[in-house]
Amino acid sequence: MFKQLRPALASLLVLSLVTGVAYPLLVTGIAQLAFPEQANGSLLRDAEGKVLGSRLIAQKFDGEEWFHSRPSAGDYATVSSAASNLAPSNPALAERIARDAAQERIADQGPVPLALVTTSGSGLDPQLPPQAARYQALRVATARGLPLRLVEDLVESHTERPLVGPAVVNVLALNMALTGLKR
């Protein structure tokens, strides 16, 4: 029996070392050399180097002076991130959307963009379409006492246009840039 067990244990040990130690160390080393920012979580830092968040995970911003992220079904908690799984016919979904739209509605701005009242699949999408960010510009400019044009220019300068897919604005990066604006 030991004759059969020995090769199995040796295989287990070798494969455990290769797949559990060598391969992860190799991939981590390559990632740190080739993509250090992404390998470390795409962290955003303030002027003093303090980590404020990740470009990859949405944060909740309350108050009129901030651009708001998409609603989150899991209250922006990474542990419980998920979609709401409410069917379009569910009255609870219609009530939540109506409530969120009423909170986001700005007079004379037209209908609230869909991205500001619907949750994403993960509940943690950090980006908004540029239209949703521009929709909030008047509220943010008024609350901060800034010229509307300055805030609109900030949205435009933070609009990312990937090679594939629609243009997006990272809400955390945009709000970080807002803190640097002077009245």
Curated annotation (Swiss-Prot):
It is a single-pass membrane protein. GO terms for cellular component: plasma membrane. The chain crosses the membrane at residues 10-30. Keywords: ATP-binding, Cell inner membrane, Cell membrane, Ion transport, Membrane, Nucleotide-binding, Potassium, Potassium transport, Transmembrane, Transmembrane helix, Transport. It is found in: Cell inner membrane. It holds the Pfam family KdpC. The keyword Transit peptide does not apply. Belongs to the KdpC family. Part of the high-affinity ATP-driven potassium transport (or Kdp) system, which catalyzes the hydrolysis of ATP coupled with the electrogenic transport of potassium into the cytoplasm. This subunit acts as a catalytic chaperone that increases the ATP-binding affinity of the ATP-hydrolyzing subunit KdpB by the formation of a transient KdpB/KdpC/ATP ternary complex. HAMAP family: KdpC. PANTHER family: POTASSIUM-TRANSPORTING ATPASE C CHAIN, POTASSIUM-TRANSPORTING ATPASE KDPC SUBUNIT. This is Potassium-transporting ATPase KdpC subunit. It comes from Pseudomonas aeruginosa (strain UCBPP-PA14).
